[in-house]
Regions:
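Short, conserved loop/helix-junction motifs that constitute active-site signature segments
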Residues: 1-6
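Helical "substrate-binding/catalytic lid" subdomain
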Residues: 85-204
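Rossmann-fold dinucleotide-binding core
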Residues: 9, 14-95
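Short, proline-enriched alpha-helix->beta-strand connector loops that line the catalytic pocket
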Residues: 7-8, 107
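Conserved small/polar residues in nucleotide/adenosyl-binding loops
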Residues: 209-210
């Protein structure tokens, strides 16, 4: 008998744990379909411009018919391997995003505590080896201490927690990821979840004496 999903490809583009995508894959295949994951890297502007990065996990024969759609959404598709690898890659990238957000926020707050002019330290960081596309995108937020969300802190916290949990399930732990995940959990609990990911600065500032 024909199964419900015969001839259909189901693609999950949301950010969930690799283990969750593997569970969905089993359900889809049991119904006769094919499954792949394709979370994206990039926020509002890349999504609008069609310059997202597509982080694909799945079989090559599933990827091929999807390339035209991915070409509209993003500037490049990375094929990481089987289902679970694409979502794992997304957690790697978003863990870096969280760690960078924490590190730059602490650096900006440290400069304030040392009595250093914010605009001057931002220019110095931007001219150093510690510059990055993220810093250039977010530097005005730290300068103004206002954090309208491009990627909300609550979503960064969710992804960091996913990364920590996946590592624990595999019997592993990474200290920076765990520490930053806890910092972001505290920021969400303190009411900063709707701020940009760089808004962890506000939680750190509240705990400091400047």
């Amino acid at each position: 008998t024909r199964k419900e999903l015969d001839g259909k490809i189901i693609v999950n583009m949301s950010t969930i744990a690799p283990s969750e995508n593997l569970a969905v894959k089993a359900i889809v295949e049991a119904a006769g379909g094919q499954f792949a994951e394709a979370p994206v890297s990039g926020s509002v502007v890349p999504a609008t411009n069609g310059t997202l990065l597509i982080l694909f996990g799945g079989e090559e024969n599933v990827l091929n018919p999807l390339q035209k759609v991915f070409g509209i959404l993003g500037k490049k598709t990375f094929h990481f391997g089987s289902v679970g690898k694409g979502s794992g890659a997304k957690l790697v990238l978003n863990s870096l995003l969280g760690i960078f957000g924490e590190a730059y926020s602490e650096a900006m707050l440290m400069a304030r505590q040392f009595g250093i002019d914010t605009d001057t330290i931002i220019e110095a960081v931007g001219g150093s080896a510690m510059d990055s596309p993220m810093f250039q995108t977010k530097k005005s937020l730290w300068a103004n201490r206002e954090f309208p969300p491009a990627f909300a802190l609550k979503h960064a916290s969710k992804d960091l927690n996913l990364a920590v949990n996946e590592l624990k399930q595999a019997g592993n732990s990474l200290p920076a990821v765990e520490t930053v995940a806890e910092s972001y959990r505290q920021a969400v609990a303190a009411g900063y979840g709707e701020q940009d990911v760089a808004g962890v600065y506000l939680k750190l500032d509240r705990k400091s004496v400047v």
